[in-house]
Amino acid sequence: VDIDGAVDMATTLAVAGNVDFNGDLDVDGTTNLDIVDVDGAVNFAADVTFADGADIITASAGDNNVRVGLTAGDSIADGGNQNTLIGDRAGTAITTGDQNIAIGFEALQTEDAGSRNTAVGSFSLQNLNVDGSTYNTALGYYSGNAITTGVQNTLIGGLSGDVLTDADFNVALGYKTLSADTQGSRSTAVGHEALMTQNFTTATDVFNTGVGFGAGNKITTGIRNTLIGSRSGDAFTDADYNVALGYNALTSDTLGSTSTAIGYSALETQNFTTATNSYNVAVGYTAGTAITTGIKNVVVGGLALDASNTGQENTAIGHQALTADTKGNRNVAVGAGTLVTQNFTTATSVYNVAVGYSTGNAITTGVQNTLIGGLAGDASQTGDANVAVGYLSFSSVATGDNNTAIGTRSMFSNTSGSENTGLGKDALYSNTVGAYNTAVGEGALYNNVDGSNSTAVGRLALYTQDPASAVNMYNVAVGYGAGQLVTTGTQNVLIGGLAGDSLNAANENVALGYSALTADLKGHRSVAIGTATLATQQFGTSTNTYNTAVGYFAGNDITTGVQNTLIGGLAGDALTDADYNVALGISSLGLDTKGNKSVAIGAETLTTQNFTTSTDTFNTAVGYAAGKAVTTGIYNTLIGGRAGDALTDADYNVAIGGAALTSDTLGSESVAVGTSALTAQNFTTATASYNVAVGSNAGAAVTTGIENVLIGGLAGDALTDADYNIAVGKAALT
């Protein structure tokens, strides 16, 4: 059908073929046409329905353009392609711009050569006019209305970004988001009225992000803020570098900068009315919610530090960590419930450190405590300057000060004891009021309750020490099990593995060396220095022993002997219940078991003396090998190297000088004073010689002569078997 004139249809028109109109077409009824070409106006009084797949094609100079609306896209020229323009005056100035979408009254109205813009909503991107690919997107009434030369902005929501001019790279989603800014770039506002008042009048890279109802809605010139959550940061004006994530996070602050608040109401009341770098970090439900002007706090965990208002430089990490404190400064609380009751009502530099579940959870006003480990120091209230490291360490302390507890359950029971150091599992476990103790090693000073001034280093050292009342113990035990059975003994020094490990009520002992004084129970005032020294000494009743043994195995076999002084390797190592002996030198008095009152000074002196029954020997031997062969002789005084070194069962001899009386075995009651005096005398049967020789080599050749008196150097030095001679003077009777 070809029609050149006007056609008015009052009823239905149905045509199976094509209809070409050169004039106008007015239709009041229904028109069903396969194809309609109209050169004039087409007016429909009723609805127009297009079949699926049908197109509206409007003529323009460019290609693939869609124009619907009064003067929509009516300036498109050759080169303006693939534009979709719907609405009166939508894209009406576009000439050569491509791939633009404008939907709405006067949307994208002034753009001519710009491309790839999307404007949906009345007056959206109305004033944009920039050549090139700008990639602006505006969706909503008046969104991006004032943008002239800005690029790559995404604005969604009524009045979103509606006064931006040449700003770039902004994202605004929500009613009136970014609705006051003119030249700020690189902001992201998502949510009703987010970043609503931000306004930069000069080109500025802002980098603000506001996501949530009213997020950052009072910011004017603040930059680089990230605010996510309804009302987050909604009081900020020109604050910078803040992060707020969560409902009401950082909702009161106006000029505080460099804060981080993540969580519901985190840092909710923080408010700096002058420009301040707060450096606060709060992460968790109501974390740091009461902070007003406190600075440099790090808060991570639900309810952490949520009562503090002006506290500074606190670190609280964990649920309810530091939850009650209001004005305390410089605390570190890491772990759920750490320092949960601490509360300083006036500004105080506290310096408490608590790390671990519920560590320090009873502290109220204690300061300078360091507590590390689950439940460490969890009963401490007002104690100061304590250190506790380990699960349940220092777990009962109420008021003790200046304690250090490191290790699981170390100082577990301490209540008021002060100045203690416990290092190791269960060290000082039972201590309550004891003070000035040092325990290093598992179970060291484990049972001590009231004792003070003890030092135990080594596993189980002083394990059972437990005086019945508060007593200054002054015990020192160093080594595995050293003094482990001491209960009420005091002033003992026990150093070495198992040193004094059986002592219980003994006092004032010194044991230094592995197994030194290891068997004694109640002996007092012994000194044992060296491996296994006095190792078998054992007094079952309280006894002042006054034994001193110094050297490897010195006095090793002594059981109940007292007042012995044994110095040197193996010195007196066979003595058992012998008393009042002195042995100084390796192996000196080394074989005797029950001889008493002997003095042996020098290597191998009296080395073979041996009394098997208790005997007062009164032997004195001083010098290398002096009296070396004496076995059961008594009352001998032998002084000098090898003096009387062949005597065996001889008695009452005096030999003073090197090699004096050096050959005799059974002669008794001789006196030889001087080098080599009576050096050859030798009685092979028990004989009272009554010889006296004084002087170098005096009587040097006498062998079996008796009752001679020879005084002077070389006096009678040639006599052999002569008797009853007296020679006085140098070389007399020579």
Task: Identify the residue ranges that each predicted region occupies.
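Fibrous stalk/shaft segments of extracellular and virion attachment machinery
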Residues: 1-50
